[in-house]
Amino acid sequence: TGLVSGDSIEPDKEKNVITKETETVKLSCSYSTTSNNVRLYWYRQYLHGEIMFLAYKGARSVSAGKTADNRFQSTTSHTSTELTITDVRLSDSALYYCALR
């Protein structure tokens, strides 16, 4: 299923996050939906690069979800999703997207 009328998702803060290598960063998005079967996705895009999958998790799932790298963990609630990046590296410098499906 795709985005349904009335569904929305947006970053909690549109900002640049500045951190040091090896630290932990948390990014979050708030969403609303009328669907009971929702998956929340995280992607990143390097400057002039393709968008790459990072993680997804069912909105109402207690399982860990799927990630492309174990440094990335996604958590969800009924109104938000959070991406935690541990052991931050210089190569994590990118634009991050959250998506609802």
Question: Which role does the model predict for each range below?
Answer:
Residues 1-101:
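Extracellular domains of the immunoglobulin superfamily
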